[in-house]
Amino acid sequence: MRVLLIHAKRFIYRTRMKAIPEAEDINGVQGEGSFENALVVFTTVESRDTSNPKEVVETAAKDIVEIASKVGAKTIVVYPYAHLSQKLAPPHQAKNILAMLELEIKKLASDKFEVSRAPFGWYKEFELHCHGHPLSELSRNYEAKTTARVEVKKKYYVLTPEGEVYSPEEFLEKASPEFRAVIEKEALGKEIGGVENPVNKLCAKFGFEWEPLSDYGHMRYEPHATLMIEAVGEYAWILARSLTIPVLKVKGTNMFDLAEKPVYEHAALFGDRLYELWADKKHLVMRYAACHQQFSMLKDYVLSYRDLPLGMFEIADSYRLEQSGEVTLCFRLRRFYMPDLHILARSVEEAVKIAEELQKIIHREAEKLGQTYYAVYNVTEDFWEEKRNLLLELVRRDGKPALITVYPAGIYYWVVNVEYHIVDSAGRPREIATFQFDVGNAKRFGIRYVDENNKEHYPVIIHTALIGSIERYIYMVFDAAVKMERRGQTPYIPTWLAPIQVRLIPVNPSSEQQLSHAEKVASLLERHLIRVDIDDRQLSLGRRIRDAAREWIPYIAVIGDREVETGTVNVTIRRTNDRVAVKPEELLEMVLKDLEGYPRVQSTLPRYVSKRPTLVYLEKEVALE
């Protein structure tokens, strides 16, 4: 908060016209005023004041009263003035803080001074006659030393599919090792430290790297990583479209104005992990999911009860200011891609029904990778007490006990917030997929639908990331590979996600016949949008086969003179370690079977390996133990 204090012989103001839509109702404060011997406090409320307004107001009021006493003023006038800083608080917050300041000054000194406040958000004319003594013109800058934090008291339970309720401590002996790890971390505060995570090595091996010229927690995506990011994004959309409800796909911006009340209120609920910036005198927040953009669109739609349920999907360019010491490749990032799906439902009961389809997809996609989810249900106290039957229905669908965290009602926008955790190869619970039942944001953003009686209602909004963020899904894929190797299997990634799906290796790259055969096979595969390349480098066959294995290519096909004569290729299949001689059409069928139900994304690399520069990240030898 910045203030300019003028000790005035005379001060007169009159409101002229509204300056902003959020202007204060002048019926509540004086629309005009005339004062003699007044300390006029020209006051700018800044964005930083909103983190702990109580401390700022108390500090400012105490100082203002002391100054008024020193100069011998008869009246203190709090006068909103937006010109002392470029970093303004949102209007609705500034208005509240100015009212708090007026009340605090009255509380401290109503027996000594008259206290008045001019209306906020108006253009005003004023006349000022300054005394001109040494203390008649002063400026002050008030800042909270601490950020106000409200400690949220939580209760923890374990709820079984049979409806039994346990304390976390009671259930530990019954829990599987993986669920025990979830309970210990989430409910008992036990952290696993000092364990090197082999998944980080795989992320780096496939070209997921930190960008040293950016902020902490920002990644760059090399060609292999870029392909994987694009493929997972396409797959997330395929899953959204597979739902039995209509889903719209949209795109939007990545920053929103905190001066807008719904944006500010939603951000305040999110907490202190916001990326904020100032531009053109505006205080902006980088979005942390797709909520702002999708809700801004949905508020403009004309919605009937017949339109619901209705989904909206976007891959949101998302930003969260995670602590620099906690960022982890592909998992905890400051900038990431979130395939965010929001579904409008008519009621919480309808949302529970819709969630059945979501839960099936969430569990199925983890199981495809050989992973198992363990659920943490964050619920409000009123939902826990009054709608436990609905909660039990959700837990029964998961098919295993769930950890329940009960929060006081009314502090968040959701009544149910479900986190699905895997326990990774380092023994740490990792949240991947999620869904929530949101009962607050429809009203906050003005999203309405009309029922069969032509009455308006606010829908319940389901938030879900069916496979988590794109990077976290890839983390889960790599973690599954680490677990494979520990079981004695050859680690692999699914064919649809492999940057190169087939590599053709002529035994003699100088042989026109072998190279021609490889090119014909490549053309056949490419016509079906299969990612294939040809290793035509003048290196030994053994070296080129090892390089292909280092890239975890699912199908490595060697072509020699015999293959040219017989019209075949000699294929090594990574997943099974089988080696087979097949016709090109048979190889095509093998790959197409792997790709059934998955996206086809064009390669991010040249067809010929000889045309690549040296990709340093591929040269790394990775031991997963």
UniProtKB/Swiss-Prot annotation:
The lineage of its organism: Archaea, Thermoproteota, Thermoprotei, Desulfurococcales, Pyrodictiaceae. GO terms for molecular function: ATP binding; threonine-tRNA ligase activity; tRNA binding; zinc ion binding. InterPro entries: aa-tRNA-synt_IIb, aa-tRNA-synth_II, aa-tRNA-synth_II/BPL/LPL, Anticodon-bd, Anticodon-bd_dom_sf, DTD-like_sf, Thr-tRNA-ligase_IIa, Threonyl-tRNA_syn_edit_dom_arc. The gene is thrS. Gene3D superfamilies: Anticodon-binding domain, Bira Bifunctional Protein, Domain 2, D-tyrosyl-tRNA(Tyr) deacylase. This is Threonine--tRNA ligase. Zn(2+) binds at C291, H342, H463. Its main location: cytoplasm. Pfam families: HGTP_anticodon, tRNA-synt_2b, tRNA-Thr_ED. SUPFAM superfamilies: Class II aaRS ABD-related (SSF52954), Class II aaRS and biotin synthetases (SSF55681). Catalyzes the attachment of threonine to tRNA(Thr) in a two-step reaction: L-threonine is first activated by ATP to form Thr-AMP and then transferred to the acceptor end of tRNA(Thr). Also edits incorrectly charged L-seryl-tRNA(Thr). Residues 197-494, 198-494 are annotated as: Catalytic. Homodimer. It is found in: Cytoplasm. It comes from Hyperthermus butylicus (strain DSM 5456 / JCM 9403 / PLM1-5). Keywords: Aminoacyl-tRNA synthetase, ATP-binding, Cytoplasm, Ligase, Metal-binding, Nucleotide-binding, Protein biosynthesis, RNA-binding, tRNA-binding, Zinc. It catalyses: tRNA(Thr) + L-threonine + ATP = L-threonyl-tRNA(Thr) + AMP + diphosphate + H(+). Its EC number is 6.1.1.3. Its cofactor is Zn(2+). CDD domains: ThrRS_anticodon (cd00860). GO terms for biological process: threonyl-tRNA aminoacylation.
